[in-house]
Amino acid sequence: MRRGRGSSAVAGPTVVAAINGSVKEIRFRGVRKRPWGRFAAEIRDPWKKARVWLGTFDSAEEAARAYDSAARNLRGPKAKTNFPIDSSSPPPPNLRFNQIRNQNQNQVDPFMDHRLFTDHQQQFPIVNRPTSSSMSSTVESFSGPRPTTMKPATTKRYPRTPPVVPEDCHSDCDSSSSVIDDDDDIASSSRRRNPPFQFDLNFPPLDCVDLFNGADDLHCTDLRL
């Protein structure tokens, strides 16, 4: 917005100026007049690319000073403002708040525990603990003796019994223990049960062979499960 120049005077909630005998209202940067007579202040944030609402004020001068304070915070001392920085003028709201906060911090309250604040942390030095392999002994010296640790209760374990293998299930591999005598009879070290059938289920039935009387002449492999 444009800022008018000339001698200004405050008349109620509006700021007017006399130019060539005519009264004209001065317009400040970042200030707009509402239809009901109050003045609104806003500023454009250069980082967010959006307008920031500063509030509504009773006079245009108050709204202009609020804009100046926000402009200095966003753009620094080189910001374009409505009023120059003057020691006689009241400080902006944020500067006034910082001064009041500093004054309150300098006052000592007898009913306040100052150990809870960061300004008094120098009274309580912090001991830096070494981060070496001897950390266990260092921690023990700071925190006192270690509490006795409870050993977990041990449960008795009994040996598992080997699984019982059925007598019908035998292995036909070469590693099975067996003894061959001179009569070509195979005597197994373990007690085996005679197979129920003397024929192989993988071959077709033999009609010309007596399965019961001529068992010695039958040459076939036994199917053992």
From Swiss-Prot:
GO terms for cellular component: nucleus. It holds the Pfam family AP2. Residues 127-197 are annotated as: Disordered. Induction: Induced by jasmonate (JA), ethylene and Alternaria brassicicola (locally and systemically). Moderate induction by wounding or drought stress does not require EIN2, whereas induction by NaCl does. Transcripts accumulate slightly in cycloheximide-treated plants, a protein synthesis inhibitor. Seems to not be influenced by ethylene, exogenous abscisic acid (ABA), cold and heat stress. Gene3D superfamilies: AP2/ERF domain. InterPro entries: AP2/ERF_dom, AP2/ERF_dom_sf, DNA-bd_dom_sf. It is found in: Nucleus. Its main location: nucleus. The keyword Zinc-finger does not apply. CDD domains: AP2. Residues 27-84 bind DNA. Residues 132-143 have a biased composition (Low complexity). Keywords: DNA-binding, Ethylene signaling pathway, Nucleus, Plant defense, Repressor, Transcription, Transcription regulation. A motif (EAR-like (transcriptional repression)) lies at residues 199-205. GO terms for biological process: defense response; ethylene-activated signaling pathway; negative regulation of ethylene-activated signaling pathway. Interacts with SAP18. Acts as a transcriptional repressor. Binds to the GCC-box pathogenesis-related promoter element. Involved in the regulation of gene expression by stress factors and by components of stress signal transduction pathways and could also regulate other AtERFs. Contains a slightly degenerated ERF-associated amphiphilic repression (EAR) motif, which may be involved in the activity of transcriptional repression. Belongs to the AP2/ERF transcription factor family. ERF subfamily. This is Ethylene-responsive transcription factor 3.
